[in-house]
Amino acid sequence: MKRLLVWIGALTVATSVFAAEKPALDVRDFGAKGDGVTKDTVAIQKALDTCVANGGGSVLVSDGIFLTGSLVIGANTTLEIAAKTSLVGSADIADYPVINVRWEGEFREGHRALLTASNAANVTITGAGAIYGAPPVLSKLRNPRGPVLIELIGCTNAVLENFTTQYQQLWSLHIFFCKNFTARGLTIRTVGANGDGIDVDSCDGVTIEHCDINTGDDAISLKSGRGLAAQNLARPTENVIIRDCRLHSSIYAALGLGTEMSGGIRKVKLENCVISGKQNAIFIKSRDGRGGYMEDISGVNLTVLKSPTFIGIDLLSKGIQASDPVPGDTEKWPRVQNISFKNVRVQDVTALVAGKNIPAARPIDDFSLTDISGTCVHGIALANMTNVKLSGIHVTGYEAPLISTENVKGTGLELSTKQ
């Protein structure tokens, strides 16, 4: 029996080594031209399908500009976009089939992404090349939704690394119902409203590291659906680590949490990042009818540059209401607790915290700021919070008072005008 197990183990290792050593499938061998004029959709898709049929491996796109419509990546497949190589989205909407997607927190029809994978394990997109989305005439579509750049749905152990993307007025990466996802070394550029960088939507186990994201809308947005159906589905976005990144939004926030958060957002860590936003560096946002929760959100070792607000909190927003809002005088509001930021350096920030748009019916519990230094014009404005902890707030250039509160309980509030 032991010999049999040893033989099986050796065979498994040998098979794995063989799979790893399979030569990459070159899309040119399947008819791709890479001339920037010919549509290479069929050829590239054939290479991807052949890779899956072979039990997995790599597909190589290199040395050219490859015009393509929507492509589907299967399990155990690595798509490599080599240096000095571009994938460019077609301008023909017929090249993006309509499927069921989650958009603005609810399920509806939408055009399939330029690159997509669905319910697939071990999908990787890598390489030093670039991915350019469809022109604005397509990305601005809303009914049905236009094609996002990359969309992973229900995938496990997916990795996106080292490439560059450019898009406008629609999301670059939408990661939905995924588990164990990594984005590493990406350079993401977008312009315009809805031009998010990475949207993490009801996912568990997300690492975003060493990325440079400069966007129109939120650089990174954490979501989990909106309304009673999303709350009952109970698929939170959780166990998220964002580290060693540069995040900038030219319209909204470097990191947005909500407003679509009815399934919950929890266990989020932002570490060793340089962040800035046109409105907020970090924006915690929701409204009545969302329900759900946000908890265990932390940031440490951050540099905040030239932002009107370091942390903005608006739980009374007028964002799009769900078709099935969560009912109840208290339950309709999100439960927000255990929010902490430590060792933060701010530079040319107008306000440290704008946190007064919070419902009295559901105060935020356990909000802490520790060791905040730098320059700001206005300080910390809080309302409807319990267990607030402020310590080591060493900023200069502000207009008094440093701390303004209304219906707030906690420690370190001595400089506030109200208790």
List each model region and its residues:
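Bacterial N-terminal signal peptides
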Residues: V6-S16
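Positively charged n-region of N-terminal signal peptides that target proteins for export
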Residues: M1-L4
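Extracellular/periplasmic carbohydrate-active domains that bind, remodel
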Residues: F18-Q419
